[in-house]
Each structure stands twice: as structure tokens, then as C-alpha cells.
Amino acid sequence: MISFPNAKINLGLSVLSKRPDGYHNIETCFYPIPWNDMLEIIPAKETVFTSSGNNIPGTSASNLCLKTYTLLKEKYPLSPVHIHLHKRIPIGAGLGGGSSDAAFTCKLLNDVFALKLSAAEMEDIVRPVGSDCAFFIENTSILAHEKGDYFSHPGIVNLSGKWIYLIHPGIHVATKEAYDGVVPNTDRKPIGDILKQPLSVWKAELVNDFERSVFEKYPAIKTLKEQMYKQGAAYAAMSGSGSTVFGIFNTKPETFHENTSNIQSCIAPL
């Protein structure tokens, strides 16, 4: 069986408070976007993970797809499989590609082995794999709370008919580095309230808290956001802790940045 794990963007991201477990409480909106990997799972004599496309750091044994298989196998009698991932979504880019691969592995295994797991059951299985993994089970726009792994208001925003332009500039921003540059603050306008307003209002009100410190350290990322607005974006931002920048357009935008070995981009209808 084959599936196509998609990326996501963050529409706004508020860092609210530091948690006793060392993580942070956040509020954000996850929105699925059509930048996809390809995932195939077939029966095999022994369980193995292989990949192609973008290079995936680490060993096969540490891959999130294989980790998800192992978690499921602890609860259900799964036979061996060959998991192959063709990686197109940039890695460490604020697009949730690894989390999506894990979630789609769970969904595909659910189909392959006819486990008949509900969405809620699959969310519980993948939640330990990564904070935003559970989002990709239902895979619809939604508000995320706490560590980004509990949800409310599914379908909160619909950008159908718009276009998205994403550029990953080949800059790695470590998640810890991004959080270290943010001062948590609970005195915020709820992101859900902002998203209910017209798209034209978002530029003034919908903020990603990571941008200020990340832009100071990596001005090239800030420049990309400015270029999106110069191209006519109705809204532009950095996704998650970076470094991908996206613009939302009313019509198909013109390309202003060439792809290289380090820089990847995607233009697609939403």
C-alpha cells in the first residue's frame, strides 16, 4: 500500500508558558498543505526501513516510521513489513514532515493489517512519537494546545481557493535555540479569534513568536518573508520554529527564488 504524507504550516504560534516537564505550552493553528512525501508498506520476511530522496539524518533504527511500527507491534500481532519512504518534504524545516511520516505509517498499518483503530486510538499511539504527530491523523485545520498535541476547533479555517508559496532556505534552526529566544507570555489575543477575521487582518495580528529572535540571528529568513509581501502575499510568516517561510496568495504567485541543492520551494493551490 502507498500513501502520501503531507506537510503542515503553523498559522500563528504563541508561546504561553514553560511547563514543569521542560516543554512549553503553546497555541497555534496547524494547517495541512500539499507538499508530500511518498510512503509504501509491503509484507516482507523481516522488518526493514529504506529511504530515497532527501537525506534523512540518523540511522534506520531511529526513524519515526519504524518507531511507529514498533509501538503498534507492542499492542498488536503485526507481521514483518518493508517500509520505504521517498522524502521530499524538507527536514527540520518547521513543516512537520517527520511527524507526518509517522502518523501516515500508523494509518497505513491500520489499513494493511485491518486493525480497525479509530482516529482517537491512532492519535494516542503516535502522540509519544512527536508533539504534532497526532495532528496528521485527522489532517484538517485545527487549533493545537499544550505541547501542540491536544486539539480543538477542527476545521477552524478554510483557505480553499488560495495559493501557497513555501521556501526552505537551507538554514537549520534548532528547536531549543528557537525556544531559548522567546519570553513566554499569556497575555495574548487568542489565535482562534484572529483566524475568524478576514485574511487581510492577519498581517497585523497573527504572529509567530519565534520570528523575532530567529530573524535577528538569521536575517536571510526575514528577507524571505519581506519578499513574499513584495510579491503580493496576503499573509506571510515563518512556519513553526523555522526555517521555512510561506506566503498565502489570492492568485498563483510568480517564482522569485530558484531551487538549489540547499534551497527547496513549493507553489501549490490550497
From Swiss-Prot:
Annotated ATP binding sites: 90-100
Matches recorded under SUPFAM superfamilies: GHMP Kinase, C-terminal domain, Ribosomal protein S5 domain 2-like
Stored Gene3D superfamilies: 3.30.230.10, GHMP kinase, C-terminal domain
Reaction it catalyzes: 4-CDP-2-C-methyl-D-erythritol + ATP = 4-CDP-2-C-methyl-D-erythritol 2-phosphate + ADP + H(+)
Secretion signal span: none
Reported function: Catalyzes the phosphorylation of the position 2 hydroxy group of 4-diphosphocytidyl-2C-methyl-D-erythritol.
Enzyme class: transferase
Active site: 8, 132
Pfam family, one: GHMP_kinases_C
Species annotation: Cytophaga hutchinsonii (strain ATCC 33406 / DSM 1761 / CIP 103989 / NBRC 15051 / NCIMB 9469 / D465)
Lineage: Bacteria, Pseudomonadati, Bacteroidota, Cytophagia, Cytophagales
Annotated protein name in UniProt: 4-diphosphocytidyl-2-C-methyl-D-erythritol kinase
Recorded family membership: Belongs to the GHMP kinase family. IspE subfamily.
